[in-house]
């Protein structure tokens, strides 16, 4: 929420100081926690997380380029899925929210924010489908090719660290893999094959306590 506020103001030509961003972060804390239904072990635990969040935001703003120009911030996007290799309409839209698009020397750079517990070079394959989906949405809606993509990591170490990891524009290889995965997913739905793959996404699934409990029983 804090970085969204910073970049929305920057998009309007207003640069907020880190203290202002942290203040807005804390003002939005309560409503955001209520909306997400989050709970804490104690008031002290919640206060510690607030301080951690403010520290990460402050470190990020000190690290980010001072002259960075946001083109779009926290933008909800949707585009019909057309296989770029064949032109086939897959009959469903791709829906996503892109954290940030900034103007670079060679064109637009698509950035996604992540938090992590430790510093490390992220495996590109781990983020490949997400980055490719953002690239697809950007190209469909803008008619342009991105200059690159970034994972911007806010590392929750004792002294907060900020790491930017850049990746090149997506290629035909990326899109072939992406659409192969989409087709596999659609084929599985059509055939009624619902494989048991528990993970963090289960918390967002309507079938976590019903169909999945019955799978393989």
Where do the protein language model's features map onto the residues?
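Residue-level signal for well-ordered alpha-helical scaffold segments within enzymatic catalytic domains
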Residues: 1, 5, 55, 59, ...
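Non-catalytic, well-ordered alpha-helical scaffold segments
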Residues: 1, 51-54, 129-132, 199-203
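A non-catalytic, helix-rich entry segment at domain boundaries
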Residues: 2-83
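A residue-level signal for conserved active-site and pocket-lining positions in enzyme catalytic cores
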Residues: 3, 53, 100, 134, ...
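Metal-dependent nuclease catalytic regions and adjoining charged, substrate-binding loops involved
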Residues: 19, 122-124, 137-217
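Short amphipathic alpha-helical segments and their helix-coil junctions
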Residues: 36, 110, 114-116, 181-189
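Short helix-to-loop capping/linker segments positioned immediately adjacent to catalytic or ligand/cofactor-binding
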Residues: 40-44, 61-63, 86-89, 118-122, ...
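Non-catalytic protein-protein interaction segments used by genome-maintenance enzymes to assemble
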Residues: 72-141
